[in-house]
Amino acid sequence: MIHVVAIITAKPGMREAILKEFRANVPAVHAEAGCIEYGPAVDADGMGAIQTPFGADTFVVIEKWESPQHLAAHAAAPHMKAYGAKVKD
């Protein structure tokens, strides 16, 4: 199993717009062969010193894939290219 933790930092004030596009793409990713887990996570407020905050413009993507080949296919998927085009700016 392949684990991926991707840290995404949006331009200031754009995190929610990026997350909206991300969440719209999640069903297509979940339907991919080899996808075990794929989803966004944002900082929880008020966790105290135990948490190192990423900031208001950042979120984390947690991914699990059956194999490196499945992850490579995911990266090349048409819906990922379309997502990338929507959020590149």
Predicted regions and their residues:
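Short, conserved charged micro-motifs
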Residues: 13-18
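Active-site-flanking beta-strand signature of metal-NTP-handling nucleotidyl enzymes
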Residues: 2-8
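An amphipathic, aromatic/His-enriched active-site/gating alpha helix that lines ligand/cofactor pockets
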Residues: 24-36, 55-89
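Basic, Lys/Arg-enriched alpha-helical interface segments
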Residues: 21
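Short glycine-biased active-site loop of nucleotidyltransferases that positions the nucleotide triphosphate
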Residues: 49-54
